Amino acid sequence: MAEKKGSSSEKLLYCSFCGKSQHEVKKLIAGPSVFICDECIDLCNEIIRDEATASEKDAAAATRSDLPTPHEIRESLDQYVIGQEQAKKILAVAVYNHYKRLKHLGKKDDVELSKSNILLIGPTGSGKTLLAQTLARLLNVPFVIADATTLTEAGYVGEDVENIIQKLLQNCNYEVEKAQRGIVYIDEIDKISRKSDNPSITRDVSGEGVQQALLKLIEGTMASVPPQGGRKHPNQDFLQVDTTNILFICGGAFDGLEKVIMQRSDKTGIGFAAQVQSKEEREVSEVLPQTEPEDLIKFGLIPELIGRLPVVATLAKLDETALVQILIEPKNALVKQYQKLLAMEGVELEIRPAALSAIARKAIRRKTGARGLRSILEQSLMDVMYDLPNYKGVQKVVIDESTINGDAPPLLMYEEQQPKVSGSN
């Protein structure tokens, strides 16, 4: 019972949990027909604190108990991404420091470590998205890719920036703790640059406005996400996701940024002793590593957003040699993938060195980088893959330079028969 009659006819109140009377404790708090004392409240708080600390430790351990070193991260990236050595080194250090910081979150320290988000600058098909995907797979953390061009300010038609966090939650079955240690890759970040470096009086709902909205997300905020997806409406409960420890990697081609950099560097090269190079002599890949925050501001990113992306890595345009390596060397190389597909039909695929070079040159002409390699190879093998299940006795398919250039179909080699070209009667 929470109350009993004493000898002096006064009602004695007792704690409903520990049974102590009001005279044995400092405070007794009343509820509907129940009471709780200050000692029981302290005990409950202690239990909650212990559970919170334990869950934080578990989450940190789940992030990665055996966090790979920068060298190990770099070696893993090498298995999937060809070239871009400096960018891989910068990313390895940044990601290692980020997750090392998360592992030590529960510990008391005088120095608070801030988050270092990453900005990747490089042409289309240079490996920006692949680098981010590979990092997430290596660290076994939730990962999502968002397209900055589809985002608008809240209240306008288009995707709200908080939709990014909703997609991240979907990728980890709505486990909030996991999502709060994930990686978000925001592609095409350069496409939301403001139209000029002077603030405009007109509304720019897909430019500076989106940058401002992203800024809050990147620096850390409590994002309200509808449970199990769906649209927001006032009478529903929201999942609260703290974005403070989510690693944001932003990437973009930044076409024209090299001109901004050259204008700045040309101003410094004045005087009799100055060495002035013509603009034509300077390759874009030579200029981009000289990127300074002022260049990005001139390009159209707001200073606050640049301040939240302190780690900047530039990726070079891939040349013919690098593209050929991409076709054959990585673990999931395109040539290996198509060889596996044809092996399922019991057929060997041979792509000759001249054909590999022709594929690389075609991708360079199309200005698609590594991204365009698959479509070129798919186009060259389309007829073969269509007809192969109907052919009997095919042992090998050979692709040479003429096939890639569209001058001749692939060569089909039969068991103990003469070679035959695909599609011939």
Curated annotation (Swiss-Prot):
Binding-site positions, ATP: P123, T124, G125, S126, G127, K128, T129, L130
Alphabetical list of PROSITE patterns matching this protein: CLPX_ZB
GO biological process, one term: proteolysis involved in protein catabolic process
Keyword Nucleotide-binding belongs to the record: yes
InterPro entries linked to this entry: AAA+_ATPase (IPR003593), ATP-dep_Clp_protease_ClpX (IPR050052), ATPase_AAA_core (IPR003959), Clp_ATPase_C (IPR019489), Clp_protease_ATP-bd_su_ClpX (IPR004487), ClpX_bact (IPR046425), P-loop_NTPase (IPR027417), Znf_CppX_C4 (IPR010603)
Keyword Cell membrane: no
Domain ClpX-type ZB positions: 3-56
GO molecular function: ATP binding; ATP hydrolysis activity; ATP-dependent protein folding chaperone; protein dimerization activity; unfolded protein binding; zinc ion binding
Domain of life according to the entry: Bacteria
Signal peptide coordinates: none
Pfam family name, one: AAA_2
Keywords noted in UniProt: ATP-binding, Chaperone, Metal-binding, Nucleotide-binding, Zinc
Gene Ontology annotations for the cellular component aspect, listed alphabetically: HslUV protease complex
Binding sites annotated in the UniProt record for Zn(2+): C15, C18, C37, C40
Coiled-coil positions: none
Function per UniProt: ATP-dependent specificity component of the Clp protease. It directs the protease to specific substrates. Can perform chaperone functions in the absence of ClpP.
Family the UniProt entry places it in: Belongs to the ClpX chaperone family.
Subunit: Component of the ClpX-ClpP complex. Forms a hexameric ring that, in the presence of ATP, binds to fourteen ClpP subunits assembled into a disk-like structure with a central cavity, resembling the structure of eukaryotic proteasomes.
Protein name: ATP-dependent Clp protease ATP-binding subunit ClpX
Organism of derivation: Cupriavidus pinatubonensis (strain JMP 134 / LMG 1197)
